[in-house]
């Protein structure tokens, strides 16, 4: 049925909760401690997380509006944007014996975290709202077959060739021709990160174990050693592959002309940089 909308409101959206989402993780860990103060551990985690809407916006309307979908009113259960299929963690921690007549003690730790990059969706950068959902940039990409690709209208043959090369080289697209891409279909490249922790304990009241602890933490320590290490990548949740450059209408039939967007995944300039922090803690 059709209901009239009070003109005091921009949009009236009826949303409801869903219980379709779920996640699971499987982990294995090895640990070993040595009497001279060395502690080692290594773990591997495999898992997946699924959702129909990750709810990453501040209000329900934005969560509905910006959700990547073929039909915004009927989103499908797909990978969550927070899905991390594989993660490896290694911890190395050494605590020295007390020295300087029991006054000092040093602690050194390294933490390695390796994991798949963030998930992202393949989308179309539309020049207008063609599917009528009120937003121009949330439509998932249709992956044409070779025959369909040959029949599509492109701004140039170069754009057609580049789009075809993208489909055949993308790990997801080449196996899903003739289908719409799923939300969060693609996984970013493997990311490696090493963090360094150093602490110096100063025992100023030995009988009670009271101490002053000075700390130095270097986050993404590998990037401090080499600017090419510790890089993380992001695409702002989506990769816009195609855009509609124009639409011709003849006899009531709309025919779009497509252009290739030359999409790229770029390093995240903030999280890829090393950070350093110092601290002081007094216990008594």
Predicted regions and their residues:
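Short conserved catalytic/interaction loops centered on acidic-Pro-aromatic/His motifs
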Residues: 206-212, 223-234
